[in-house]
Amino acid sequence: MKKNLRIVSAAAAALLAVAPIAATAMPVNAATTINADSAINANTNAKYDVDVTPSISAIAAVAKSDTMPAIPGSLTGSISASYNGKSYTANLPKDSGNATITDSNNNTVKPAELEADKAYTVTVPDVSFNFGSENAGKEITIGSANPNVTFTEKTGDQPASTVKVTLDQDGVAKLSSVQIKNVYAIDTTYNSNVNFYDVTTGATVTTGAVSIDADNQGQLNITSVVAAINSKYFAAQYDKKQLTNVTFDTETAVKDALKAQKIEVSSVGYFKAPHTFTVNVKATSNKNGKSATLPVTVTVPNVADPVVPSQSKTIMHNAYFYDKDAKRVGTDKVTRYNTVTVAMNTTKLANGISYYEVIENGKATGKYINADNIDGTKRTLKHNAYVYKTSKKRANKVVLKKGTEVTTYGGSYKFKNGQRYYKIGANTEKTYVKVANFE
């Protein structure tokens, strides 16, 4: 039986809203304890076993004006722990006295005094992870996917991106602190949106495109892609007739795009270039937290666009399109006796049925057609059968004998006489056999 994971916190809470279990009342000075599943399995990130990601929200203080009273700053947030493919979260209390906020000069700052557009470091002390006594003595590594998050195992240690700890006799891993750097206090009075602009024209853009040639080995370097994007686009907020630049991490965006396409990158940043790929560049304002994303299409002209092998097939029964989950896509269909370009082989989807993927202009479309509407299904007659043209007329004088294997196409048709028939014969002729003859 698995144990629910709870997060309890000294810097965190008098009352913690913990998912997926009910809220748990704790004394204000309780240490942060995370109760995890009983079996420790490695995180998908091989660098650490438990992924801890704090999320901190800071609001800047607003000075008194003629139109509004002074508003103090505030700090709220949560700590999430990802373990064994599941995520669990505990909320930090507003303006927790146990959490320490420091500015760039390492001066301690009260939540009420937070200023906009300044980077702060938030330190949450006494964090523990409870994996149960059955894991006592095991060694685990704790880390975070967020590069701004660091940990200290003991008081006086230098913060590190990962820490290796040995569980005590109760299966508990104890940390001296969790630190979150680059926390920006949001100015709630500043309403300007973030937009991307073309460097040359100054025009606002919602999509982008760059072209880069690969080297003679068909490779690109991440730095080349980053430079191409950064030289063509910038992000900014417009206010009081002026633009204020908003920074964005293009390198991480490029790496994420390559990872999504399962393209390997060498230790020095080289990768085998595809003909085209899309980089989603996100810019977030440190002043008011607003953001914008610019999808940039990167084209590599001297790398051939790969063509998916395909074949032409005749549809023998009206066919709808389906997605990879075997769910119908829209109402469009390919009518019988028309041809369609499909992949060379069928694919078995989630429902266990074989489908052909539709190919258009040498590209896989992600749309599928039931293979039964193209290749048919072989069935054995249980009775002698005539071949019909209509419900009343036979197509010919042929009598199909019991035990004969016949290929039928698609689902059955209901004729005017109320009986159901299968289409047989890989042709455009009206040739049908009663379904009852196969039962």
From Swiss-Prot:
Keyword Signal: yes
Annotated GO CC locations: extracellular region; peptidoglycan-based cell wall; S-layer
Signal peptide: 1-30
GO terms assigned for molecular function: structural constituent of cell wall
Keyword terms: Cell wall, Glycoprotein, S-layer, Secreted, Signal
UniProt keyword Chloroplast, yes or no: no
InterPro entries: S-layer_prot (IPR004903), SlpA_C_lactobacillus (IPR024968), SlpA_D2 (IPR055005), SlpA_N (IPR055006)
Compartment(s) where it occurs, according to its Swiss-Prot or TrEMBL record: Secreted, Cell wall, S-layer
Source organism superkingdom: Bacteria
Descriptive protein name: S-layer protein
Organism: Lactobacillus helveticus
